[in-house]
């Protein structure tokens, strides 16, 4: 008679995570002939970084970056502070110069799903992501020039256009494995001519 009650939130599994488990994993095993299921590349984390160099002059700018990153990622970002003082940039040690959020687990899957299906198609004159920005170990980093491509950001309420860097960290050993994983997840890479 003991019955476990499941909350509705515990049943919801991100769409991309389900796709990875159901079809992408088996496709990668066939393509790269893995002997062990643990060799299959998987996502570790996604880091979204927003550098705000002008925050050295105006400290209010960092609040806008934190607000935007919170809306985009769904979690409160860490404020990045200057490690060294640099006189030419009028920068002192400990001054806020940016913000970053590290996404793992279901938040990471949800963010990538929104990025690939909603945000990237909204970029003007978008021809695909460059396939050359892998770091040699299967991790991929790319930059976005403005934050308004995310539908969580209200275009009328932004104080200034801010770009961001997004790094996708995988367990892939080579760039080819990482590229195959991200392509299967729906990343629109340019076809190299």
From Swiss-Prot:
Signal peptide: none annotated. Coiled coil: none annotated. One of its GO terms (biological process) is translation. SUPFAM superfamilies: RL5-like (SSF55282). The keyword RNA-binding applies. Keywords: Ribonucleoprotein, Ribosomal protein, RNA-binding, rRNA-binding, tRNA-binding. GO terms for molecular function: rRNA binding; structural constituent of ribosome; tRNA binding. PANTHER family: 60S RIBOSOMAL PROTEIN L11-RELATED (PTHR11994). Part of the 50S ribosomal subunit; part of the 5S rRNA/L5/L18/L25 subcomplex. Contacts the 5S rRNA and the P site tRNA. Forms a bridge to the 30S subunit in the 70S ribosome. This is Large ribosomal subunit protein uL5. It comes from Arthrobacter sp. (strain FB24).
């Amino acid at each position: 008679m003991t019955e476990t009650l499941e909350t509705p939130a515990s049943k919801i599994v991100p769409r991309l995570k389900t796709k990875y488990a159901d079809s992408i994993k088996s496709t990668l095993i066939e393509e790269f002939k893995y002997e062990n299921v643990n060799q299959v590349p998987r996502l570790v984390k996604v880091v979204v970084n927003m550098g705000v160099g002008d925050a050295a002059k105006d400290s209010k700018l960092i609040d806008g970056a934190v607000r935007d990153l919170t809306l985009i990622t769904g979690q409160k970002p860490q404020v990045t502070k200057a490690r060294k003082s640099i006189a030419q940039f009028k920068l002192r040690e400990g001054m806020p110069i940016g913000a970053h959020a590290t996404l793992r687990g279901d938040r990471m899957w949800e963010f990538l799903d929104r990025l690939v299906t909603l945000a990237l198609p909204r970029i003007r004159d978008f021809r695909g992501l460059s396939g050359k920005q892998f770091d040699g170990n299967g991790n991929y980093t790319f930059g976005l020039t403005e934050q308004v491509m995310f539908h969580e950001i209200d275009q009328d309420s932004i104080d200034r256009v801010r770009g961001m860097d997004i790094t996708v960290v995988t367990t892939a050993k080579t760039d080819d494995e990482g590229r195959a994983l991200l392509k299967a997840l729906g990343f629109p890479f340019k076809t190299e001519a």
